[in-house]
Every structure is written in structure tokens, then in C-alpha cells.
Amino acid sequence: MESRVLTGGATAIRGGLPLLRKPAAVMKFTTAAHAISRDFPAGAVTAKPVGPLIAGPNLIWGRQLRPAILLETSPKRESIKPCSAAASSSAGSSDSSGDAKVGFFNKATLTTGFFFFMWYFLNVIFNILNKKIYNYFPYPYFVSVIHLAVGVVYCLVSWGVGLPKRAPIDSTQLKLLTPVAFCHALGHVTSNVSFAAVRVSFTHTVKALEPFFNAAASQFILGQQIPLALWLSLAPVVLGVSMASLTELSFNWLGFTSAMISNISFTYRSIYSKKAMTDMDSTNVYAYISIIALIFCLPPAIFIEGPQLLQHGFNDAIAKVGLTKFVTDLFWVGMFYHLYNQVATNTLERVAPLTHAVGNVLKRVFVIGFSIVIFGNKISTQTGIGTCIAIAGVAIYSFIKAKMEEEKRQKKAA
């Protein structure tokens, strides 16, 4: 996608300029420079560099930045687009339009795929380590605080070194992010309560309903029309994940209710985080959400689990695994939690909330599969069939969604 340059600044020009010999021609940068020097006296035309050639308000960000030279001839400006540096010395090394070719790793599809891969990978590690901690330290409120606290420290250090640069936040953005952070905190705590109360697979079975919550919210809250075909394509996804989870199924009302509350909370967070990204990049958005969410999580952790932790909670955990392993486990589970959520937020910035939710369901298949292997659970035929159905459902959804997007582009082009 070519970045187009729009600038309100006037290009410097002196009166009485003759027209260019070929006003409609688009030439290479070096050819343009020779033509200008040949056809006009020195100082007759001032070329104004735009985009990355100068600093200031003319810097335009697109999928790919291309430098351009604007020449003002009569009432009309013409853009002379240069080829790449290599192309300027070798004719035929680029296409006739002079557009710089997009590198393989700059393709949007590949980049989005990489985000999804890292999201899945980090989430699998987090879920396995998190469940191992709950096996000897069943205090989900405190562990939830540790998850967020490690992430907040990570954000503060990143801001300190300028990676990324901290975006200032005003009162309007704070008001927008506060309810999002509250739902993030509520969804996070209730998810951990469910993970501590039941097996990993059961929690993910209930949370597989998230796409339906997202679809309903997108249609009835945001006013987006979700076609029937997309609704139907979500059915095999949820059914498949549910089937894959049944081999570890151990019903528990606390775990079930907590997972349902988590679904509703994360649905609100996903949709309104998308709105918050209009004025701030996703990395800074998630950093501020983590800080505010930590404040919300502290009171319940102190009042609900504080007395138990001081009496025997910490001592029991240290007696079972040792102080070093206990502290190390808490640190790494917090780090993986923050990283996988950061990547998930970056992924949400690139796709629609419903697509993000379906990807989240497929992620659960990976989590269930790895948890079966790590914790020594037997894999049944039903688990394998359910996994295949879920993957097939995601493929059907992706095909229908891509076809709909292509039809929209064709209508706009017409």
C-alpha cells in the first residue's frame, strides 16, 4: 500500500516558470534531477522534500514510507517517485512505476501470523507454569497481583529506556481506560480463581464461549451487523474445543461461574480497548491498563487472602519447593503473563475483535493439548476429533470472513 503525501505547505516557486517538457511523466530520482537542472536556470525551481527526507509535520506513516519530491508547475503539482538506491544505478531492477518493493517480512499477513504464533507460544508456557504454581500455592488473588506487578515493573523499565517511548495520558484517556482496566482486572482474577479451582481444560471449555459473547457485543452494543454465516461458523469452533476438553472435565460451580464472569469481562475489555487505540498505540494502552488494573486487584488480595498467606500460605509453599523456586516461579509466570497479553493486545490492534476472539479459541486448543502432555493426561479419540473440528471451524470462519472483506473492497473500488 503506497503512502500518499498530503501537505498544506506551499512549495517555493518564482513567477514566470516555463512548463516541464513532459509534465505527466513519472521519472526516477536521478533522471528527474538531471531534467530539472537542464530545463531551468539555477534557483528557478525549489524542490521540497517530503516524508522521511525532512523532519516536521510532513512525515507520513504508512505500511511503507517512500520519499517523494513535489514540484509545483502551473496550478498542478506532480509527484516524482524515486526508486530504491539500487534501482537508481541499475535499470530494470525494479518495476516501471518505481515503487519500492515490500520486503517479505514486511507483509501484513506474515506479520499478523507471527503475532498469533508468539501469542500462542507465550500463552502455553504461562498456562502450564501457572497451573504448576497452583498445585502447591492455591492463592489466585495473590498470584493475580504478582502477574500484574511484574508486568508493571517491566513497563516502567521499558519506558525508562525509551522502548517504547511513554505516551502521555490525559484525563479523557484516563476516563476511557479506567473501566477497561477494571474489566481487565476482574476478568484476570476470575480466570485465575477458575484455574485454581478446576482443571485447565474445564476453564478453557467454558471460556471457549468467548466468540459468542464478542459477536453478541459487536452486534448489539457496537451496532455492527454480524452475518448469519459467521454466526454458524462459530458453532464448530466452540463445539470442537468443548469436545477436546471433556477428557479433563471436572465440574465445579466456582470454576464455572468464575470462567463465565471472565468471558463477559474480557469481551468488554476487547471491544473498548479497540476504541482506546485510536489515540494511543497498543503497547502504551496495555501498560496503562496494567497499572490501573493492579490498583483494582490489590484490595481483594489483601482482604481475602492476606490473613491466610501470613499464617501459613507462604510458609507452606516454601516448605514444598524452597524459597528460590517459589520466587523464581512467581517472577517468570508474571513475565510470561505480561508478554503474552502484550502480544495479544498488539494482535488485537491488527484485526477485528471477533477475529481476535476466534484466534483466542484456537489458542485454547494448543493450551489443552500441551497441558495434556505436560501433566500426563491420556489423549482420547474424542480429544483428537474435537481438536480437528475446532481447527476446521476456524478455517471456515477465516474463509467466510476473507470472502466478505474481498466483496467489500470490490464494491468500494466500483
Swiss-Prot record:
Family matches, as Pfam families: TPT
Q: Does the keyword ATP-binding apply?
A: no
Gene Ontology BP terms: transmembrane transport
> Topological domains (Chloroplast intermembrane): residue ranges?
79-108, 163-219, 305-382
The transit peptide of this chain lies at: 1-78
> What GO molecular function terms would the record report?
antiporter activity; organophosphate ester transmembrane transporter activity; phosphoglycerate transmembrane transporter activity
TM annotation in the entry: 109-129, 142-162, 220-240, 285-304, 383-403
Q: Please provide, in alphabetical order, the Gene Ontology terms of the cellular component aspect for this entry.
A: chloroplast membrane; Golgi apparatus
Report the subcellular localization.
Plastid, Chloroplast membrane
- Membrane topology of this protein: Multi-pass membrane protein
The alphabetical list of record keywords is: Chloroplast, Membrane, Plastid, Transit peptide, Transmembrane, Transmembrane helix, Transport
First-listed, main subcellular location of the protein, grouped into a coarse class: plastid
According to the UniProt topology, which residue ranges lie Lumenal? Answer: 130-141, 241-284, 404-414
The protein's job, in short, is:
Mediates the export of fixed carbons from the chloroplasts into the cytosol in the form of triose phosphates.
What's this protein's family per the entry? Belongs to the TPT transporter family. TPT (TC 2.A.7.9) subfamily.
Q: What is this protein called?
A: Triose phosphate/phosphate translocator, chloroplastic
Q: Which organism is it from?
A: Solanum tuberosum
